[in-house]
Design a protein with these regions (language model features):
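A conserved amphipathic terminal alpha-helix motif
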Residues: 103, 109-149
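Hydrophobic-ligand binding "helix-grip"
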Residues: 29, 39, 55-103, 109-112, ...
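Residue-level detector of alpha-helix boundaries and kinks
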Residues: 3, 51, 80, 118-122
Length: 149
């Protein structure tokens, strides 16, 4: 049983600026409407503590493990509910340069026996959370570019 969410947004800022906003976990409370807090060390194998507040959904705290960190390009973590195979999801942020702008691809693939029961919530609340985070990240990165120009 699996299901995926994929979103993308173009940002009028260099990838280095977008990356700096994305990996400044301590500032999430200042701008991020979806992952309202995040704490931990950014290194492959390290565990984070994230608090999600999906629009219209139930808030939750989870402890994903960073599975990929490519400086300036990719941040991916694996979250799971309890034991493997119940409800697992690699959550991925990938930055690509596009003609002086940055494309953020924000996605998650969900696996496990609970996925069929969670699909409606994923397609509504979680997807809206991804989109809200993307828009807020764009706003914050573009504001940084404006203040340094």
């Amino acid at each position: 049983m699996n299901h995926s969410l994929r979103t993308a947004i173009d940002i009028d800022a260099p990838a280095s600026v977008v990356w700096d906003v994305l990996v400044d976990l301590g500032a999430y409370a200042d701008w991020n409407p979806f992952i309202v807090s995040a704490d931990g060390s950014l290194a492959a194998g390290e565990q984070l503590t994230n608090r999600l507040e999906p629009p219209g959904g139930r808030a939750m705290t989870f402890k994903p493990t960073i599975t990929e960190l490519t400086e300036g390009r990719v941040l991916e973590w694996l979250g799971r509910a309890g034991i493997p195979g119940i409800f697992d999801g690699p959550h991925r942020f990938e930055l690509t340069d596009v003609d002086g702008r940055t494309r953020l691809e924000h996605s998650e693939a969900f696996f496990g026996i609970l996925v069929p029961f969670m699909r409606k919530s994923l397609d509504t609340h979680t997807l809206k959370g991804f989109e809200a985070m993307n828009a807020a990240l764009r706003e914050r990165a573009e504001a940084r570019v404006r203040t340094t120009s």
